[in-house]
Amino acid sequence: MDKSKRLFLKSKRSFRRRLPPIQSGDRIDYRNMSLISRFISEQGKILSRRVNRLTLKQQRLITIAIKQARILSLLPFLNNEKQFERSESTTRTTALRTRNK
């Protein structure tokens, strides 16, 4: 190879493969809350397959398990963190009103 061509070659960096999110021993079940909660966003939405890095079959089973857990009220349909923020702000305003009087 010429010297001029050798300048443009980049060395290939090694990368570490990520472990699969679901091991072979894990059971995808609506009662397995520690497993299911990994695949839900902070807002309570089911994360996409691309984000989860799951196979199609695993994603389908996770989705069904999450929906069953929601129906049985093991999981909330929505995370209502915004309501808590609003309630805190209303308590602050009422506290300020009482101070001013």
Swiss-Prot record:
An annotated Gene Ontology molecular function? structural constituent of ribosome
Task: Please tell me one Gene Ontology term that the record gives under cellular component.
Answer: mitochondrial small ribosomal subunit
Subunit organization: Part of the 30S ribosomal subunit.
Q: Which UniProt keywords apply?
A: Chloroplast, Plastid, Ribonucleoprotein, Ribosomal protein, RNA-binding, rRNA-binding
Q: What is this protein called?
A: Small ribosomal subunit protein bS18c
Q: From which organism does this entry originate?
A: Gossypium barbadense
Where is this chain's protein located in or outside the cell?
Plastid, Chloroplast
UniProt entry tagged with the keyword GTP-binding: no
Matching entries from InterPro entries are given as: Ribosomal_bS18, Ribosomal_bS18_CS, Ribosomal_bS18_sf
